[in-house]
């Protein structure tokens, strides 16, 4: 047989060459990959490998199977049996003796190190306690020495002042006694310090011993375990199903339930829990055997011995049920507490923060008020706004009747001042534009009707500075002209009158002045405050004078705005464009709006992706009083929404989502406003209240008669204010005006049209129809009477004469009285009269008759009266009992 090379032998044995070289080296034979291997060397290697296999670590593998049957109820009342087999496998490895010795040596070294550390910790604790005791003893000695020196100085002064030897002896005795006391105190302090030292050392030793025990148990070696579960254990639902099946089976057994032999207990944790459940069911059935051991499944809840005071977090609005859940009480208890406070509510009713705070504090809980708009306030406050205010251009809204040349006037101003020199005029009209004049810039709002004007004012945003009222010189004042006057007056905005069509032959400017003077618009030449400018939109006459009049009025108003910093403004109009998405026309009021800014606009937010001016040109920024069209919002905002530039887009999104969620609550809350029955709820002390009314009637005579009658109802406390009035049906403009002014809509022999009803329903306005003028006057008078503060009156209900005075340890002086008039009632306010002069006013605390507490004593009976916090009651005094009643005032 020829010798093989080592490489060929490795290929034959299917091992690597390096591995085979290492095995030869372990057997004591040095070989390389190209060396030949003889038969003798093969035998030597085989013997070496066999010895290694025999001397290897021993392994022991244990396998265990557990079989059980699970009954699962099926459809139709039948149960199905499922066989469950749980397999477990464990492998134990015998350690090498040398490895065991090494581990034992390491454990011994670790225990010695822990013991050394424990001894060092004990010694360190003893040293620290000793030093602490010495410091305390030294400080105590210093304090006692100082006290002793102070006492000696005091004693010395006292001895120097004393002249007799007897007093000197007394002082010396006192001094000796105090020294003894000081010594006793010092001894007690040393004992206390020694006791603390011993306790500290004992505690440290116990802690070190406990740590050593824990380390000992942690360091204990455990056999190497390889556990494999081949099946998932029974789930909780399966155990519940098994319990339900057992109950059904046991319920069907009428006899022999107790006589049945117990099944052998299963082993394992699942069997143990099943046994516990069986025991619990047996205890419930109340079988024989007397007192049973409590099952682990029985709940151990104990009712609290006293009320638990909680920290209740209350938002701006909360329902009664939510408040009860936060306080962990039943809703009926909260309703009872509210009834005690004088408020009726159902469990689903929304209450405000103040009411919820009163109820929670009344029930003994601590209230934490949380403002839900904290994030919104934080976002709004974290804005970089400039400090220096500069003059800004006025914002002008042009109003007037539809046929009076308002559109022509706007077109002429745009064609001459905005797009001069540009072929084709304006490329795009966005509802607002600004013009440059020699004296300054003016911004015009071109809004259809008065929608944006009133919606902004309803939201508290004063976007318009001046109103230009366009009146045709040949037509005079028309219904929409009157509506525009009412809107301007309600907003408190100055009016500049443009008398249009002055070039017509039938033009009569004086007639326009006379008609407008009836509505409070007086020209300056008549002593009024309104400027009248004669213009012609067709011929172009008077346009420059109109612009100068607007700038003059703006100069009087002294309009200023901050130009630098983050911008804020209002939405003039908005729409959804098919190619560009949500588009909003924004009028900047303060700061500068840049392209790329993050804006928060009502319920919407976004980054300004593009800005265009009224000419359709791309712009990068816009200052105060400049209208621009912005793209990039998440949705279409509403006209009149506030536009604010913020820093963080994520926070802007959170605020927008919060506003969307809050909108429903605000809408529900708005349903309670401007109701005649709830007018008195809005009453505030010290203010003159107003009942705002928008009146529409069938004829002008009815309007004047009703207006005069309502205005005559005004008093010093409640005023009737006619916000708007007119002839004809109730229109959408009337409803919008009522919503912006928080007014009541009154229709006399007229009705509201479809668009007005839609606004009335969405804004939850109070609309009332009348056909008899007396009913209208009476209901408004009742509403005004409800706004009057009630009158308080004191009514005497009883009088008692003091016949004798007794002393009571609980109430002090008790007056024995005879009731001479009326009835004496307990806990009522009283007055004590002596010689018909009031000497005390307080409250009746105790009322008894024949040692029994009573609530009232009638005329001709004797009783004992205890006056709260008053004991100077004398025989012959008169006790007067009265009650305070509220008299509701009415308007005559």
Curated annotation (Swiss-Prot):
CDD domains linked to this entry: IF2_eIF5B (cd01887), IF2_mtIF2_II (cd03702), mtIF2_IVc (cd03692)
Question: Where is the segment annotated Disordered?
Answer: 66-305
Q: What are the boundaries of the region G1?
A: 400-407
For this UniProt entry, what's an example GO CC term? cytosol
Residue ranges, annotated region (G3): 446-449
Q: Where is this region: G2?
A: 425-429
Domain tr-type G: start-end pairs:
391-560
Comp. bias (Polar residues): 68-82
Which regions are flagged for Basic residues bias?
254-269
Q: Where is this region: G4?
A: 500-503
Any one GO MF term held by the record is: GTP binding
Please give the residue ranges the record annotates as the region G5.
Answer: 536-538
Residues that coordinate or bind GTP: 400-407, 446-450, 500-503
Question: What task does this protein carry out?
Answer: One of the essential components for the initiation of protein synthesis. Protects formylmethionyl-tRNA from spontaneous hydrolysis and promotes its binding to the 30S ribosomal subunits. Also involved in the hydrolysis of GTP during the formation of the 70S ribosomal complex.
What the record says about family reads:
Belongs to the TRAFAC class translation factor GTPase superfamily. Classic translation factor GTPase family. IF-2 subfamily.
- What PANTHER family does this protein map onto? TR-TYPE G DOMAIN-CONTAINING PROTEIN, TRANSLATION INITIATION FACTOR IF-2-RELATED
Q: What protein name applies here?
A: Translation initiation factor IF-2
Question: Organism source for this protein?
Answer: Salmonella typhi
Gene responsible for this protein: infB
